[in-house]
Regions:
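Short amphipathic alpha-helical interface segments
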Residues: 25-67
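Short Fe-S-cluster ligation motifs
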Residues: 151-168, 367, 405-430
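Local cysteine-cluster metal-coordination motifs and their immediate loop/turn environment
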Residues: 120-131, 336-339, 376-394
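C-terminal accessory region of radical SAM enzymes
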Residues: 243-246, 286-314, 339-383, 389, ...
Length: 430
């Protein structure tokens, strides 16, 4: 008997007793004991050839006595997990299904929209991905935003993220959210936090989650990349949420070379002092000149992830732009995502009567829906391709002018992150 399998199959240590076995070509994985891991190594070494007497003798060198029925049971378990296959037909079918599953589905519906009610901001963050956009744009009225969002809700969009600019620069933000919020609609606010304290009592009942940007509890360190404006308000905000609703707030830090050495200590301090989760995000360069600012964010270790229940699962990743995500600027122009609100990526205007057809048939939409990691040079043969997805197309475009360009400067980090997600997958499901 000969088993078929992906030659790049990965064995990743999970803990002292177990391992994660991952099959890259079909993105299937399972947790395995030491005994099963030994069998996998044997199968790989023998190129899939199964001779039961040889396997029995192989195990004896580890002082393990196994019967043929036990070995068959192990193999059946690996086959049921779709890590190994008894015949070529099953292997080919699995490969075809995987490739079809990764492609964009025409029935995919938009379910998340980034709302930019304004691009005005009272900060001037050095790494802002929207800093090149003019804050002098016209802005839709209160009633226009309410009507637009209610139309999107009727299309089954159920997640609205208010961002900017600083969304709280709009004095009517509370009015807009109050009008569109219901039990089936999730609302999130991305804010620098400086203006939030004065309005948090009104927003807390109608907003599901808040993300506030902060790099340090030290005003001088925080001001290196951000601003000192409203710093005390942000600290008061942490204390408020710590007491009232710690699970509704996340603190987001952008990792750069200026803060890479202190960010983990900052994360720990926020979590221990306020009971609030921290989210570290990579710096997104706006051009090649900013590549020098990139630092590799720390990968949360397993103990930290267990303690704070961070979700680092092993989902198959692909960019959601134009498939389940859209972004709308202050004038109502629609874009694939919040990081690519550039003239060349404008899809339509939300006020147009036929905007849905325009978006669906746009050449920009087709470009994003045709992005496949299996077609990317340097990625298509990588064992981690379905876990990392090849990286962010917005970064690739801003740095290289090509949505499909390989992000060599992020590759090592993305591999480490992928391996960690593999190790964490079963912890999360416990």
């Amino acid at each position: 008997m000969k088993l078929l399998y992906d030659k790049k199959i990965i064995i990743e240590k999970y803990d002292d007793e177990n391992y994660i076995i991952y099959s890259p070509f079909n993105h299937k994985f399972t947790k395995a004991s030491k005994s099963v891991k030994k069998l996998v190594l044997y199968i790989l070494n023998e190129n899939g050839e199964i001779e039961f007497e040889n396997i029995i003798n192989y195990y004896k060198q580890f002082d393990i006595e196994l019967k043929i029925d036990e070995i068959k049971k192990y193999i059946d378990t690996l086959v049921k997990a779709k890590l190994f296959f008894y015949n070529q037909e099953d292997y080919d079918t699995e490969k075809r299904i995987t490739l079809e599953d990764y492609r964009f589905s025409p029935t995919q519906e938009i379910d998340m929209v980034y709302i930019h009610p304004t691009l005005r901001c009272n900060f001037n963050c050095s790494y802002c991905y929207n800093k090149s956009l003019a804050a002098t744009q016209k802005e839709l009225t209160t009633n226009q935003w309410i009507q637009i969002i209610n139309k999107l809700k009727a299309m089954n969009v159920n997640y609205f993220i208010f961002t900017g600019g600083e969304p709280l620069m709009r004095k009517d933000l509370i009015d807009i959210i109050r009008e569109i919020k219901d039990d089936n609609t999730k609302v999130e606010i991305l804010s620098n936090g400086s203006l939030l304290m004065d309005k948090v009592d009104q927003l807390l009942p109608i907003v599901d989650s808040f993300v506030v940007s902060l790099d340090s509890l030290d005003i001088k360190k925080n001001s290196i990349n951000r601003s000192a404006v409203g710093f005390n308000n942000i600290i008061n905000l942490l204390e408020y949420f710590s007491e009232k609703a710690p699970k509704k707030l996340r603190v987001r830090s952008v990792i750069t070379k200026e803060n890479i050495d202190t960010i983990q200590a900052f994360n720990n301090e926020i979590q221990e002092k306020y009971g609030i989760k921290c989210v570290n995000v990579r710096f997104i360069p706006n051009n090649k000149d900013e590549l020098s600012l990139i630092a590799e964010p720390p990968i949360p270790d397993i103990d930290d992830t267990k303690k704070y229940k961070l979700d680092l699962g092993i989902r198959k990743y692909r960019c959601g732009a134009c498939s389940n995500i859209l972004a709308i600027n202050p004038e109502g122009d629609i874009y694939p995502c919040q990081s690519l609100m550039l003239p060349e990526f404008k899809l339509a205007n939300i006020l147009d009567d036929n905007w849905q057809d325009t978006v669906a048939n746009s050449e920009v939409t087709k470009k994003f829906r045709n992005i496949k990691v299996d077609d990317m040079e340097n990625c298509k043969d990588c064992a981690y391709r379905y876990i990392c997805g090849g990286g962010c197309p917005a970064i690739a475009y801003k740095v290289y002018g090509d949505l499909n360009h390989h992000l060599s400067f992020f590759c090592d980090y993305l591999e480490k992150e992928s391996r960690q997600r593999m190790r964490m997958a079963k912890i999360i499901s416990k």
